[in-house]
Every structure is written in C-alpha cells, then in structure tokens.
C-alpha cells in the first residue's frame, strides 16, 4: 500500500476511535511503531468495538463514545465470547469456504488488544501519575499457537530459501536473464527500476533486515565504505547492521542512478524511491513485497522479503555455527528465536543417520 494511501486510511480509522485509542496511537507513534503496524492495530480495534456494540456490552451509540469503564469491567468470559465470535463468524471473503477467521488472524487481534490494555493499565499516566485503570483482563486470555516442531517448520521453510549458490544465482537471474522473457513494453518498465530492485533484493539477502527496516532507510543511514546500515529495530531501538560485501556493487549501481531516474531532490531523504508523474516517494512495503514475489516466482518459487531474511540467517549460521552472532545480526535480544536455523542446517544429523 502506498504511504499516502496508508496514512489516509489511518486517518479514517482515527476519526471514529475513542479518545484513549488516539492517546495510544500517539504514544506508539513516538516509539516508533511503523504506520503499517498502527494501521493493522486500528483495524483490529474497530473489529473489537463493533462487536462490543453488537453484543450489547456497551450502550454507546458509536465507537468514539465507548467509555474506558467498558474496557475496565469486561470479564474473561466476555473476551472468550469475542474469541468464539471470531472463530465462528462467517468469512467476509465470499470465495472462502472457511466459517471463521484463521487462528493466525485471531492471535493478531488478541495481540493488538493486549497492547492496548497494557498501555491503559501500565504505561499511560493520568494527572495523578496513575494508569487509567489497573485491571488487565487480557492477561487472563490465552492464545492458541500452531502446533509444529522446529524440525517440521524448518523443513517447510527450507524449500523457500535461496541457500548456497542460489543466493547469488537469484541476483544474477534478475540481472541478466529475467528481461529476456519480457515484452518490449515490459522491458522498459523493468529497465527503469532494475538497479533499484537489485539493490533492494541484495540488501535483504546480505543483511537480513526486516522489510520495514529496509523501507524506512534514509540516505544518511547507508555507509557503503564500511558496508554498515543504521536501522530502527522493533521497539524503536537504533541498531548498526553489517552488510555482506556481495551487495555493494548493486547498491552503488542504484545510487549512481537514484537522483536522475527518480527526480530526487535534497529533501527526498528515503534511500529507496519510486517515481510517479515526476514526483519521488519512499517505496512502500507492499511494492517491495510484490517486486520480490514477482522475481522469485520466475526464478524458482514465490517468496516474501521475510524469507530472504531467513535465507541470510541460515547461511550465516551455516558459516559460523553461532546462534549469538545470528541473533545479533537479526536484531534479536535472545538466541531462542534463532533455534530454527539450527534445524534448517541439519546435515550433520542426516549424515549420522546415514552411517547407522
């Protein structure tokens, strides 16, 4: 979704929200949470508030009038009824045969509500320096996680990674072969953005940064001499990230054409730009997702930018066997998250079984 459209949609949701949700939004904007995250959370709050009114758990005539006391006095049974509603509600997608929302979507909804409740009961301060209320019913609501061993998850993910020689082969394919299949009209569009697209893909594969971190990169954040970029991690922490050397040529090629091709002026701070009718804009997450999906599908299998992050992490662990190093590269505070990569790189286990 283009940044301008995203901000418009956010304003539409903000216009119907209660004052305390607007307080929450402003607080999280300062962290900073990404606009994409805040947009998704606002959507979940509307879903929840609509249900409160439909279930007669509030007498408010509209969402903006739902009082804080309503949230304060909701019971565990009330929230479980909401979860049941999500699980059994008819899907809004008329082409779907599912009766309700997926567990992943339900977990996302509950995560958004947990964040709001934590803010209202722990983080915010009223005039007396106290939170708005103390009872956090969301702490009593459990989420159901997908049951899958790390080995099973690793095997599923492994098929969607560009490991070994495939990392550079993918870049080489986009650089030299992809164009050969295109019509003359499509070639023109491809050539305009070729350097930029290769720079984005190479950066994701060479650094393992999250999509949002790549989107929010500014020119000042990129040091090609040191091959280091500065990013804002989850939670608003600034971090320096090393970038593998194979991306340098692609990044330099993009910088050589960035100003001329995308009509960039001094005020255009974004590193990755798109241009429409002569106006440069920061390239958004949706556009990068589509771009990565398009090239990867033509090369081997359609993947997301997050799979490119997994690719870097797996290759780095394979080369170092250090979960600590991988967790630092990815911006994780714990090595627990990196356990997955030890299961993807399981050649030793397979060799041991073969020798039995």
Swiss-Prot record:
Q: Which residues form the Core-binding (CB) domain?
A: 16-121
One cellular component GO annotation, for this chain's record? cytoplasm
Active-site residues, as the UniProt record annotates them: 210, 234, 306, 309, 332, 341
- The primary site where this protein sits is cytoplasm
Entry keyword set: Cell cycle, Cell division, Chromosome partition, Cytoplasm, DNA integration, DNA recombination, DNA-binding
> Is the keyword Cytoplasm assigned to this protein?
yes
* A GO biological process held by the record: DNA recombination
Q: How is its activity regulated?
A: FtsK is required for recombination.
Q: Where in the cell is it found?
A: Cytoplasm
Q: Which GO terms describe its molecular function?
A: DNA binding; tyrosine-based site-specific recombinase activity
Q: Tyr recombinase domain: from which residue to which, for each copy?
A: 169-354
UniProt cross-references to InterPro entries, sorted A to Z: CB (IPR044068), DNA_brk_join_enz (IPR011010), Integrase-like_cat_sf (IPR013762), Integrase_catalytic (IPR002104), Integrase_recombinase_N (IPR010998), Integrase_SAM-like_N (IPR004107), Recomb_XerS (IPR023670), Tyrosine_recombinase_XerCD (IPR050090)
Described purpose of this protein according to its UniProt entry: Site-specific tyrosine recombinase, which acts by catalyzing the cutting and rejoining of the recombining DNA molecules. Essential to convert dimers of the bacterial chromosome into monomers to permit their segregation at cell division.
- What protein family does this chain belong to? Belongs to the 'phage' integrase family. XerS subfamily.
Entry protein name: Tyrosine recombinase XerS
Native species: Streptococcus pyogenes serotype M5 (strain Manfredo)
Q: Which gene encodes it?
A: xerS
């Amino acid at each position: 979704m283009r940044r301008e459209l995203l901000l418009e949609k956010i304003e539409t949701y903000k216009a119907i929200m209660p004052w305390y949700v607007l307080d929450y939004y402003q607080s999280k904007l300062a962290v900073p949470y990404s606009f994409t995250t805040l947009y998704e959370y606002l959507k979940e709050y509307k879903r929840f508030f609509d249900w409160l009114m439909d279930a007669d758990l509030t007498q408010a005539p509209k969402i903006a009038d739902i009082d804080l006391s309503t949230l304060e006095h909701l019971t565990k049974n009330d929230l479980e009824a909401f979860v049941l509603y999500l699980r059994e509600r008819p899907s809004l997608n008329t082409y779907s045969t599912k009766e309700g929302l997926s567990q992943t979507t339900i977990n996302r909804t509950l995560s958004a509500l947990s964040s709001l409740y934590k803010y209202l009961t722990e983080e915010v301060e009223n005039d007396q320096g106290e939170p708005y209320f103390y009872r956090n019913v969301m702490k009593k609501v459990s989420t159901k996680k997908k049951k899958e061993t790390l080995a099973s998850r690793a095997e599923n993910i492994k098929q969607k990674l560009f490991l070994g020689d495939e990392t550079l082969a993918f870049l080489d394919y986009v650089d030299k072969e992809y164009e050969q299949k295109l019509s003359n009209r499509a070639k023109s569009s491809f050539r305009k953005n070729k350097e930029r697209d290769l720079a984005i893909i190479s950066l994701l594969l060479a650094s393992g940064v999250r999509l949002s971190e790549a989107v929010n990169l500014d020119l000042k954040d990129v040091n090609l001499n040191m091959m280091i970029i500065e990013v804002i991690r989850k939670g608003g922490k600034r971090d320096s990230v090393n970038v593998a050397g194979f991306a340098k040529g692609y990044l330099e090629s993009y910088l050589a054409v960035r100003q001329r091709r995308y009509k960039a002026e001094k005020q255009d701070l974004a590193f990755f730009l798109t241009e429409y009718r002569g106006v440069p804009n920061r390239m958004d997450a949706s556009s990068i997702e589509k771009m990565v999906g398009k090239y990867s599908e033509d090369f081997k299998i359609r993947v997301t930018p997050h799979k490119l992050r997994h690719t870097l992490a797996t290759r780095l662990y394979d080369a170092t066997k250090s979960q600590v190093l991988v967790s630092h590269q990815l911006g994780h505070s714990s090595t627990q998250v990196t356990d997955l990569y030890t299961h993807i790189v399981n050649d030793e286990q397979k060799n041991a079984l073969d020798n039995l």
